């Protein structure tokens, strides 16, 4: 680590501790050359995989787009912002856990449907109707019947 005061390359760590609920490491450093002390913070770079769309194009993961789609499905439903944010965090965590650099958008869509199903069945049906492009009432009935038959997976 370069000293911000004199630019020397050699610094030593005097103290390290976890901060921000264990999400960061705070390090107190001292420059070997000039003796000045300074603090650094380290955070893991947690990169989400790129998405492969159905047409084969690739695009970066867009958390805001995901949030907007879920909010649209949950509109006027009794689900708190905290529960929505927890569902988003769970989806992002699962995506990181794949260890893949790229993931098909279909995988993300299925994760969203699973999370919405746990949050609110009406929101799940709303999202499924758009995501799966329902064409008529029979497709709604089939999905509602499947919802009644199969318990939500945790």
Curated annotation (Swiss-Prot):
Pfam families: ATP-cone, Zn_ribbon_NrdR. A zinc finger (unnamed) spans 3-34. One of its GO terms (biological process) is negative regulation of DNA-templated transcription. The keyword Repressor applies. Keywords: ATP-binding, DNA-binding, Metal-binding, Nucleotide-binding, Repressor, Transcription, Transcription regulation, Zinc, Zinc-finger. PANTHER family: TRANSCRIPTIONAL REPRESSOR NRDR. This is Transcriptional repressor NrdR. It comes from Pseudomonas putida (strain ATCC 47054 / DSM 6125 / CFBP 8728 / NCIMB 11950 / KT2440).
């Amino acid at each position: 680590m370069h000293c911000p005061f004199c630019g020397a390359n050699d610094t030593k760590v005097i103290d390290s501790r976890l901060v921000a609920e264990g999400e960061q490491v705070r390090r107190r450093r001292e420059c070997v050359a000039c003796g000045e002390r300074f603090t650094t913070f380290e955070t893991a770079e947690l990169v989400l995989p790129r998405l492969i769309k159905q047409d084969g194009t690739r695009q970066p993961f867009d958390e805001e787009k995901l949030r907007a789609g879920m909010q649209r499905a949950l509109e006027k439903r009794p689900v708190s912002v905290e529960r929505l944010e927890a569902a988003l965090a769970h989806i992002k965590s699962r995506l990181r856990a794949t260890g893949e650099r790229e993931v098909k958008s279909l995988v993300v869509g299925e994760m969203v449907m699973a999370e919405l199903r746990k949050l609110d069945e009406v929101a799940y049906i709303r999202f499924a109707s758009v995501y799966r492009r329902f064409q008529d009432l029979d497709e709604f009935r089939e999905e509602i019947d499947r919802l009644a038959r199969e318990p939500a997976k945790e």
